[in-house]
Amino acid sequence: MTWFAFFLTFVCWFNFAPFATTIGKQLNLTPEQIKTLGICNLALTIPARIIIGMLLDRFGPRITYSLLLIFASVPCLATALSQNFEHLVISRLLMGIVGAGFVVGIRMVSEWFPPKEIGIAQGIYGGWGNFGAFGAEFTLPTIAVAASFMNGGASNWRFAIALTGIIAAIYGLIYYNSVQDTPVGKVYKRPKKNGALEVTSVKSFWALIISNFGLIFALGLLAWRLAQKNIHFLTQSQMYLVWLLLAGLFAYQTYKAYQVNKELLIGKKTYPPSERYQFRQVALLEFTYVTNFGSELAVVSMLPAFFEKTFGLEHVVAGMIAAAYPFLNLISRPSGGLISDKFGSRKWTMTIISGGIAVGYLMAHFINSSWPIPLAIAVTMFAAYFAQAGCGATYSIAPLIKKEATGQIAGNVGAYGNFGGVVYLTIFSLTDASTLFSTMGIAAMICAFMCGFFLKEPKDSFAGAYEGELAETPTKRSTIFTEE
């Protein structure tokens, strides 16, 4: 049930992309405005994933996911009722909050599966959930055409988008009444302090502050983009006001982080070796998620138009080709987790896959209209496989860093995926597709080197149970599957 909850959040999150061209024509949007809406769709997911991670660790996945699914109906209906660019900006910013749903399932899955199986379990969850992007790309246009009789014969995109929100809200109620946070007899571990991530060294505290600044920077970049002359959504004075508010948010985050970690910083508290972790490892996973999921977000948003314009294809044909990218998640993301489980080293799995991402996008840089279309598709799918397998490999490591803070760590890592999406799409909006592909390829190459030199193998990566828990007997495991 959890993967389907994730699937629905992705259907909602990406329900605009299949209709971008149609909506642009009906509401007289410029190409720059359509690109900007793609960035808006990702923006609030950045802080939302961190906030959702905190709520998740405190209240559990059952309550958190249920409320998020019900909330999804709000931006879906707002998008369906939009009459101009300003309405769409607001609705897509709100939709970014729905994109934070992924984090919830990471904690839920980690509660039900031991470390030795976490890679494939998280991969299946993520693969089927990300399949929602394909579901939106492939099925929503069909629904819109089928409902055209309610729209004077024209594609009824408003009905299709509204329907996704209604279904999500209904499933939110079903989810709340059908799942539990942990197997029977297992205690849901909560962090001792709330409001910010608890770190275990002074160096990690400063690394956390730098990490928080990066996310604020991405939001500031979006504000700058919305203030450009060809967008006309924010004035210069409004942009400066947004920057001031973001500076205040950063100051508040820093204050909360200080409150949570005050005893450590003033020397009153030290952590025993069994409780320590390096935030540097979280930061490296954040970078890996920039290069894999961040690039996936960017490519999913621009690929239909890329094939349409590069090869002169019909919109429907280009959309079906582009839909193969998220469709591949069914295979690639679980395989990344499975390889991480079976290869014997999660570190080197992450390193090699990051290198594959680099090769794929650097090859995609050279795609142009002279290429045979099948070859262009093959190169795109090569890059897609490694990017999506990288997501699976990243989240085969994230839940193993500090169990009781899994929600917050997953939220931070996930937020940087959206950071990557915002930065990459901003680069794309200012340049072209070949520049975007080369930028993503170079970033992945740097990431591969950093993982090879600095990423550490998590403690007890392939254990039968988390530290402090008894290994589950076969009988208990079968009970878990039955009760799910």
How should each PLM-predicted stretch be described?
Residues 1-31, 47, 136, 299-304:
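Extracytoplasmic
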Residues 165-188, 212-228, 246-264, 448-458:
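C-terminal membrane-cytosol helix-exit motif in multi-pass small-molecule transporters
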Residues 48-60, 332-345:
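Helix-to-loop junctions at the C-terminal end of transmembrane segments
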Residues 119-145, 168, 411-424:
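Glycine-rich segments within core transmembrane alpha-helices of 12-TM secondary carriers
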Residues 70-83, 355-370:
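C-terminal ends and interior cores of transmembrane alpha-helices
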Residues 58-69, 341-355:
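Cytoplasmic membrane-interface "Motif A"-like loop-to-helix N-cap segments
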Residues 28, 60, 81-86, 98, ...:
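Helix-breaking motifs and short loop linkers at transmembrane-helix boundaries and internal kinks
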Residues 16-17, 208, 212-242, 280-323:
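Extracytoplasmic gate region of multi-pass secondary transporters
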